[in-house]
């Protein structure tokens, strides 16, 4: 997304504020606006904008060194070039005089000539302290200009009313000391308008003797050469040209010189562009003949014709002008009279045209281009290449048109400028349509395509007709306006070509509505007040939803069916609300609350919402940005992103845009940077953030001004207001370090819209995330069929369509027999590709008879191919996960006859966990996988499979890692404890019984434990412990002794042993508390309690109520909550925990608050550490707790005995379909919606669709009857149809590893 173009402001209409040089093989152009200086290198190859606090007086570039001198007021600043063609500040010089510097001119060895009205000075800046070389004060008239020649030997000055131009000669201009004692007068018959030294391409080369050109008020061009032919003058009049002969006006002429060397190079470039034979081209031959005499070219423009003269400077003979040609031209009529020679410079060799000239107009300066060959065509055409215009004062705000085709910018001096976006000659730029002077408290809103503007203040609402051909015209005024301060002013989202509705929000929580009617289409319009509505009493700030995206995400029928968010507000205490606003009639409007979120953000300073129902909120200190999903329901978290931006300074701007595929991108503006945030596809397989920073603009590369506002155009161009200029960044992606994510530069995404689709779009069916969901949904035959097609495409290097040419109906087919038949059919058609019949040891080769064999062989070949061949459209990480998933599936197939559905799910997810835990740095099996095993009836098989995957003797760390205490039944858990006691005892050489104490005592094997201590005779505690364990601990006396020993062990930090002695004292709860508080293992507490007391014991229930449930609530862990209620035999709550807010199911809020506060304190501590180490990662970078597997478990557990509210189940299904879409599995979402079977059909009243049910990718429901015919525009823009084809998915170079 590089810089496309800029509007720097209106250039100063003085040639002294403009300069260009050819330096270091680069063409450098610089000019000043009122408060800024622009530096443009090689036609915007590099661009820089430097802002000052005072008006710019003059600029000058040193052709030898590239140094830039800038005069503003009585201050002179010098900038030096850096390696990256940027200029850095080098020196600051104050003249100590009251007059402003009006002209600058560089000499040799950092000599700089300063000119003001009463003096001219030559100062040397080669040393640390400036040194005055020479100065001259005015005698009579003020200095008009003072310039130094290209060889630095002569200084020429002209005065305002003096017909004498004065020339000083410098002695030893290249030395450290020089004087200008020798001078001469150049006599003119009238006052001199302007003068110019010849600018040579190589000023220090031999033969580049300078000459001086002057134009007097008699419009005669005079050429003055060095030396005297008739006396002792320093210069003499070599020749002259009477311009009045060609230019019939007393006004200053439009003329310029082209240096002879520069002309030769430009001609060489013109010849290099010629595709045919040069000697056959008549025009090129004429130019070659002209260049052979090494002339300077003089161009004289009139409004009808261009005159081309040649001037040969010769020291031996008299010089003369020769008219080469005159050609009709289209010289612009509105160009202002020049105060010097027209600025002209050669273009780079890669451009089609040879030269550019700059002409000044009333509110702009335009760059025109032409070719040398145009000199001899029948018509000379000046083509506009750039229009320099803009604000003279810093821009305060930007307001976008509703269709995104233009913006209105407003500066601090209340000048408002409307600019519309156009594409001309392959270049994109904004054209200024009108300017309007506003009041101090006015709000402006462009209407339709920008040809109308509404201006609102506390006195009136005015409607202006704004056309670029005529000045803005006031059409009508409405006096019914708010009396309290206005917060925001916006247009309602639905309008047609003739009517629109306006809305203003005030600090009192009121909304004012007006209508604008333009049915006559004759430039007239009617403005009418509609209604005032009170929508809230607790209002801090409010803003309209960013309209970029309405045209691509909604159509009019959807707006008639659903309530669309129009604006959002937030209170002082952090209550975020979104509102729908609409006009019901001629005098009636309505505002309804759509959603509300209680945030923890107090006194927010900024909010901005998108059409995809995302709202960005900035904290009170302008450092923290949070993004909320207002569409989120009770099933998910609402805060998706929160990050502190300390490195970039305070946040001062937010702006949303929507891609053609309805993905949101947020531009966050800081002092000198703009960060683009894009939402990520939810990931089931990688820990990636919900939102990622995909692009950073460091505006310090271009300017030292501060960012004031930014706005998106509809084509993805980001317009940023900085100082008095506008910067336009197109939607392309540069291959540089400014691309923050993905980090790889080699990618298929060409612009930010493509990148947003890669991060959010539909996944191909062979992506491991989609395949994993198919397995979880028990669609193994469809899974295998996809693998087969994928294998055939990969083997033959066939381009892979994202559906692999499969029928969509296969994905929502709920009959596994049909899926099996389709798989058999595909295998039969490609059986020779998979299995050679000659290799079989049986005669029957039917696929249906040996389906397992064919599948095994296909998987074997696909796995081998994936290990050696790169899949073009997958990342290395995704390809690894695909291999992982295939291997997990293959292992689960071996157990398919021994497992139920949940057992298969556990095996698949366990295999994936084991294969990827080191890469993902996982330390424990997620509670989701624990739930699959817990609800399986084949726990013995699962335990055996887990041990095999672990591949080592089972120790406690492994038991805790795989959450075995939670999902094994009581008897199997006792067997595991017995195995742990053996393995831990044999683990170390000394065989210390203390290491297995808890296991034996939990198993009530005190005698075995005593025998182990008897064998440990080497231990100093052996005898005493054996004696102690020989007592009867069923008696109260010995329970007290065991308890005292437990406390003694606690004081010595021997926690494991202490827990065993609490258990020996029959204090199971105390033993569990030691495990939780001291050993930090709630798993050990649960396991020990279940083994010691059984699942029906009181301690387990107490632990669940006091520790497990509060922990689950604090972490929003529905899986753990479901497990807890199932153990507690509360079946209804267990089922509700999958669909209802967890807090509503837990009554003991004291423990919840305890865990929540502890968690928040820990997060704050971790966040501070992470910010101290790196500020490049968001504070909250995990996905919300939405998981489509909830509905899979819900489907397994629901029964006729436990009834769930029908409307709640309905919303739950829709929510999970939305989550599937966010995972990129839209086809699975469709299958869920098509195949879901309600136990009882929901009532019609419960089928009303709510906003949060609508997904980004859900098609709008078209009304088939009783629907009025609506227009085809939205926000004044034609509604675009849904794309016919989906962009190809390619994540091949994303750095997701």
Swiss-Prot record:
Component of the RAVE complex which is required for stable assembly of the vacuolar ATPase complex V-ATPase. It comes from Schizosaccharomyces pombe (strain 972 / ATCC 24843). PANTHER family: RABCONNECTIN-3A, RABCONNECTIN-RELATED. It is found in: Cytoplasm; Nucleus; Endomembrane system. The keyword Membrane applies. This is Regulator of V-ATPase in vacuolar membrane protein 1. Disruption phenotype: Leads to sensitivity to a range of drugs including doxorubicin, camptothecin, cycloheximide, and bleomycine, hydroxyurea, and fluconazole. GO terms for cellular component: cytoplasm; cytosol; endosome membrane; nucleus; RAVE complex. One of its GO terms (molecular function) is protein-containing complex binding. One of its GO terms (biological process) is late endosome to vacuole transport. Residues 1161-1171, 1260-1269 have a biased composition (Basic and acidic residues). Component of the RAVE complex composed of rav1, rav2 and skp1. Interacts with vam2. Residues 1161-1182, 1260-1297 are annotated as: Disordered. Keywords: Cytoplasm, Membrane, Nucleus. The keyword Cytoplasm applies. InterPro entries: DmX-like/RAVE_component, Rav1p_C, WD40_repeat_dom_sf.
């Amino acid at each position: 997304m590089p810089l496309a173009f800029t509007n720097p402001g209106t250039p100063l209409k003085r040639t002294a504020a403009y300069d260009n040089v050819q330096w270091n093989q680069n063409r450098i152009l610089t000019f000043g606006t009122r408060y800024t200086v622009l530096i443009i290198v090689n036609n915007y190859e590099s661009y820089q904008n430097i802002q000052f606090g005072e008006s710019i007086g003059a600029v000058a570039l040193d052709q030898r060194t590239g140094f830039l001198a800038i005069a503003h007021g009585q201050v002179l600043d010098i900038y030096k070039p850096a390696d990256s063609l940027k200029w850095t500040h080098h020196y600051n010089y104050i003249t100590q005089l009251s007059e402003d510097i009006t002209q600058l001119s560089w000499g040799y060895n950092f000599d700089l000539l300063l000119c003001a009205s009463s003096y001219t000075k030559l100062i040397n800046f080669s040393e640390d302290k400036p040194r005055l070389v020479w100065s001259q004060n005015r005698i009579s008239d003020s200095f008009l200009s003072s310039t130094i020649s290209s060889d630095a030997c002569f200084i020429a000055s002209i005065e305002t009313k003096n017909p004498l131009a004065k020339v000083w000669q410098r002695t030893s201009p290249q030395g450290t000391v020089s004087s200008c004692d020798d001078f001469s007068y150049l006599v003119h018959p009238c006052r001199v308008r302007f003068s110019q030294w010849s600018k040579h391409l190589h000023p220090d080369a031999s033969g580049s003797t300078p000459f001086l050109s002057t134009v007097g008020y008699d419009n005669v061009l005079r050429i003055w050469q060095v030396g005297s032919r008739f006396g002792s003058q320093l210069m003499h009049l070599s020749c002259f040209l009477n311009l009045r002969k060609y230019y019939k006006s007393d006004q200053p002429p439009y003329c310029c010189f082209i240096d002879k060397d520069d002309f030769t190079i430009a001609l060489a470039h013109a010849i290099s562009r010629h595709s045919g034979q040069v000697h056959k081209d008549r025009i090129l031959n004429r130019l070659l003949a002209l260049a052979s005499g090494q002339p300077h070219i003089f161009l004289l423009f009139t409004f009808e014709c261009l005159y081309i003269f040649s001037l040969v400077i010769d020291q031996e003979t008299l010089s003369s002008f020769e008219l080469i040609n005159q050609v009709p031209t289209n010289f612009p009529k509105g160009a202002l009279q020049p105060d010097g020679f027209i600025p002209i410079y050669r273009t780079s060799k890669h451009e089609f045209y040879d030269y550019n000239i700059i002409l000044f107009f009333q509110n702009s300066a335009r760059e025109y281009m032409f070719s040398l060959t145009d000199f001899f065509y029948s018509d000379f055409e000046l083509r506009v290449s750039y229009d320099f215009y803009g604000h003279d004062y810093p821009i305060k705000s930007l307001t976008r048109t509703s269709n995104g085709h233009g913006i209105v910018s407003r500066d601090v001096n209340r000048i408002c400028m409307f600019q519309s976006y156009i594409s001309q000659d392959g270049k994109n730029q904004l054209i200024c349509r009108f300017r309007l002077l506003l009041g101090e408290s006015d709000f402006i809103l462009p209407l339709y395509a920008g040809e109308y503007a509404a201006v609102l203040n506390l006195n009136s609402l005015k409607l202006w007709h704004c056309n670029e051909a005529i000045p803005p015209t006031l059409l009508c005024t409405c006096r019914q306006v708010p009396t309290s301060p206005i917060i925001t002013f916006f247009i309602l989202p639905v309008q047609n070509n003739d009517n629109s509705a306006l809305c203003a929000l005030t600090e009192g929580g009121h909304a004012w509505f007006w209508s604008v009617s333009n049915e006559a289409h004759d430039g007239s319009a009617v403005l009418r007040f509609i209604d005032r509505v009170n929508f809230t009493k607790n209002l801090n700030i409010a803003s309209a939803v960013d309209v970029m995206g309405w045209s691509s995400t909604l159509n009019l029928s959807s707006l008639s069916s659903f309530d669309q968010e129009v604006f959002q507000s937030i209170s002082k205490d952090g209550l975020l609300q979104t509102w729908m606003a609409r006009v019901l009639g001629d005098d009636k409007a309505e505002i309804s609350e759509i959603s509300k979120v209680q945030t923890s953000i107090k006194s927010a300073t900024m909010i901005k919402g998108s059409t995809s129902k995302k709202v960005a909120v900035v904290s009170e200190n302008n450092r923290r940005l949070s993004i909320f999903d207002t569409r989120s329901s009770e099933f998910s978290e609402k805060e998706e992103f929160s990050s502190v931006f300390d490195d970039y300074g305070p946040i001062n701007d937010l702006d949303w845009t929507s891609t053609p595929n309805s993905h949101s991108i947020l531009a966050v503006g800081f002092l000198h940077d703009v960060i683009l945030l894009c939402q990520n596809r939810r990931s089931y397989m990688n820990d990636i953030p919900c939102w990622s920073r995909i692009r950073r603009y460091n505006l310090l590369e271009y300017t030292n001004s501060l960012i004031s506002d930014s706005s998106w155009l509809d084509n993805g161009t980001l317009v940023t207001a900085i100082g008095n200029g506008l910067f336009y960044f197109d939607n392309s992606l540069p291959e540089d370090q400014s691309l923050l994510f993905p980090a790889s530069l080699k990618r298929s995404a060409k612009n930010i819209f493509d990148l947003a689709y890669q991060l959010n779009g539909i996944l191909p069916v062979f992506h491991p995330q989609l395949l994993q969901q198919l397995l979880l949904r028990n669609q193994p035959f469809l899974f295998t069929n996809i693998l087969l097609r994928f294998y055939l495409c990969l083997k033959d290097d066939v381009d892979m369509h994202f559906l692999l040419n499969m029928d969509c109906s296969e994905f929502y087919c709920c009959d596994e027999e049909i899926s099996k038949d389709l798989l058999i059919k595909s295998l039969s058609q490609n059986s020779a590709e998979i299995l050679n019949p000659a290799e079989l040891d049986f005669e029957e080769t039917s696929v249906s008879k040996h389906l397992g064999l064919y599948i095994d062989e296909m998987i074997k070949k696909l796995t081998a191919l994936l290990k050696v061949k790169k899949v073009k459209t997958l990342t290395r990480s995704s390809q690894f996960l695909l291999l992982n998933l295939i291997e997990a599936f293959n292992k689960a197939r071996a157990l398919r006859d021994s497992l139920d559905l949940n057992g298969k799910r556990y095996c698949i997810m366990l295999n994936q966990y084991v294969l990827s835990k080191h890469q993902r740095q996982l330390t424990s099996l997620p509670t989701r996988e624990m739930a699959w095993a817990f609800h399986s009836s084949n726990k013995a098989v699962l335990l055996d499979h887990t041990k095999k995957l672990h591949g080592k003797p089972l120790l406690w760390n492994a038991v805790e890692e795989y959450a075995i205490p939670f999902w094994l039944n009581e008897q199997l858990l006792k067997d595991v404890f017995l195995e742990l006691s053996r393995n831990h005892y044999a683990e170390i050489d000394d065989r210390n019984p203390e290491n297995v104490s808890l296991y034996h005592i939990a198993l009530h094997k005190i005698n075995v434990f005593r025998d182990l201590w008897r064998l440990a005779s080497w231990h100093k505690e052996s005898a005493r412990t054996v004696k102690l364990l020989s007592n009867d601990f069923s008696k109260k006396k010995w329970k007290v002794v065991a308890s005292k020993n437990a406390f003694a062990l606690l004081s010595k930090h021997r926690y494991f042993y202490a827990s065993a002695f609490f258990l020996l004292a029959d204090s199971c709860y105390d033993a569990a508390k030691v495990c939780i508080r001291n050993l930090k293992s709630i798993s050990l507490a649960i396991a020990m309690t279940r083994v010691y007391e059984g699942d029906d014991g009181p301690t387990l229930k107490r632990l669940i109520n006091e520790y497990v449930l509060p922990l689950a609530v604090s972490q929003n862990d529905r899986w753990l909550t479901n497990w807890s209620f199932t153990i507690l035999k509360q079946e209804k709550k267990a089922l509700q925990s999958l669909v209802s807010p967890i807090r509503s199911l837990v009554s003991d809020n004291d423990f919840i608050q305890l865990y929540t506060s502890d968690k928040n304190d820990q997060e704050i501590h971790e966040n501070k550490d992470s910010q101290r180490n790196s500020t490049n990662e968001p504070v909250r970078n995990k996905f919300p707790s939405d998981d489509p597997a909830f509905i899979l478990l819900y489907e397994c557990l629901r029964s006729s005995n436990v009834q769930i509210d029908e409307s709640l189940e309905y919303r739950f299904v829709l929510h999970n379909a939305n989550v599937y879409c966010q995972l990129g599995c839209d086809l699975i979402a469709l299958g869920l919606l098509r195949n879901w079977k309600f136990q009882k059909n929901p009532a019609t009243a419960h089928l009303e669709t709510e906003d949060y049910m609508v997904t980004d990718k859900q098609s709008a429901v078209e009304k088939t009857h009783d629907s009025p015919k609506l227009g085809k525009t939205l926000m004044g823009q034609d509604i675009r149809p849904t794309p016919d084809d989906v962009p190809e998915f390619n994540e091949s170079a994303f750095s997701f590893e």
